[in-house]
Amino acid sequence: MTEIVDIIAREILDSRGNPTVEVDVILEDGAFGRAAVPSGASTGAHEANEKRDGDKARYLGKGVQQAVDAVNGEIFDALSGVDAEDQRRVDNLMIELDGTPNKARLGANAILGVSLATAKAAAESAGLPLYKYVGGVNARVLPTPMMNIINGGAHADNPIDIQEFMILPTGAKDFREGLRMGAEIFHALKKALKDAGHNTNVGDEGGFAPNLASAEAALDFIVKAGEKAGYKAGDDFVLGLDVASTEFFKNGKYELEGEGKSLDPAAMVDYLAGLVAKFPILTIEDGMAEDDFDGWKLLTDTLGKKVQLVGDDLFVTNPKRLQMGLDKGLANSILVKVNQIGTLSETIDAVELAHRHGYTSVMSHRSGETEDSTIADLAVALNCGQIKTGSLARSDRTAKYNQLLRIQEMLDDQGVYAGRAALKGR
């Protein structure tokens, strides 16, 4: 009854106006699953391959018709009649069919769309919400949100070098209250920026992109906005950074052009340690470049006991890259982006490997998103304890927060808010 009888892919638009892949999977019993695939702006070199057509006469070369055709053609042929409840078999069949180490032939965007839509169809067939179908009875931890409220780097047209400045409402009693705290700080920040003469347009992920001279200026604005909203930084909420340092690592130096600094890896570690000393920053993502392993080791040895150090470009949700990091003692947390690896099964493997070794995990969106809220369910299903899905503006971001509100309602008194515990004693 749960055999796959139809798979339909189409080209839709993401939140940046670029095409992406959406997939419908239909089972023999009539159950239906739909998934839309996200896309990143700052991408790691070791990510699975997102297939784009390259035809400049169509969508400026960013079309995904080849990926759509792969789903409607060879992927459907390979999966027709396969049991959707056997997720690992579905995923492995697509990996084998692709035949490349990074899913370059069919495209990770094609494969992921089918993988997630299959899980959603199987969940519907079982009469379960996705978080419970994937995670079972232990899926009850509502994640602490990392809310990206000031954007810089590749996510904004401003001089700020660091890509994301985030708040984490760790002092909230539940997810609903944490979301409210975030929204109130967001609006207080908007007023503070406006009063100071800055623009309050929002970037790709819904955060503000003011022309501030330094990371310290951005952090200062956020702390003061929190106070205006009635919350104390360090108690009610803490701060997080996504440095995205691979983006400005050139010839062995970290080129902070906005701040006029050219730093070697040791100086970059000192720079980040200086920010941590001045502000209640408890999580830093991609503090060093993806292949600067010596820099990562120094950062981990310097800050790893008191700050969550998240590997995004470093690990690209890949169990093999994560194992390398575990062996070398790099970072202490993994960012989880389903489209970096390209299947649900491999995503689960990466999270489980991280948790087995005491690393934390953060479920994440991409800068190019859709209304699809699958990652909200997966954050709960995989007991990530943290989710990073943008600011408190733009429906492509709030779709995930709103789904978590629904999940909190479904879990009722069984649900637990991760809060500060998600940061493992930091």
Swiss-Prot record:
> Can you say where in the cell this protein is located?
Cytoplasm; Secreted; Cell surface
What cofactors are annotated for this protein?
Mg(2+)
Q: In which pathway does it act?
A: Carbohydrate degradation; glycolysis; pyruvate from D-glyceraldehyde 3-phosphate: step 4/5
InterPro entries listed in its UniProt record: Enolase, Enolase-like_C_sf, Enolase-like_N, Enolase_C, Enolase_CS, Enolase_N
EC number(s) in its UniProt entry? 4.2.1.11
Key words, A-Z:
Cytoplasm, Glycolysis, Lyase, Magnesium, Metal-binding, Secreted
What note does UniProt attach to the cofactor annotation?
A: Binds a second Mg(2+) ion via substrate during catalysis.
Give the active-site positions.
E205, K337
Mind listing the GO molecular function terms for this protein? Answer: magnesium ion binding; phosphopyruvate hydratase activity
Kindly give the PROSITE patterns that the UniProt entry links to this protein.
ENOLASE (PS00164)
Question: In terms of domain of life, where is this protein from?
Answer: Bacteria
Q: What class of enzyme is it?
A: lyase
| GO CC terms, sorted | cell surface; extracellular region; phosphopyruvate hydratase complex
The UniProt annotation places Mg(2+) binding at: D242, E285, D312
Q: Describe the function of this protein.
A: Catalyzes the reversible conversion of 2-phosphoglycerate (2-PG) into phosphoenolpyruvate (PEP). It is essential for the degradation of carbohydrates via glycolysis.
In the record, the note on similarity to other proteins reads: Belongs to the enolase family.
Identification of the protein by name: Enolase
User: Which taxonomic lineage does the organism of this UniProt entry have?
Assistant: Bacteria, Pseudomonadati, Pseudomonadota, Alphaproteobacteria, Caulobacterales
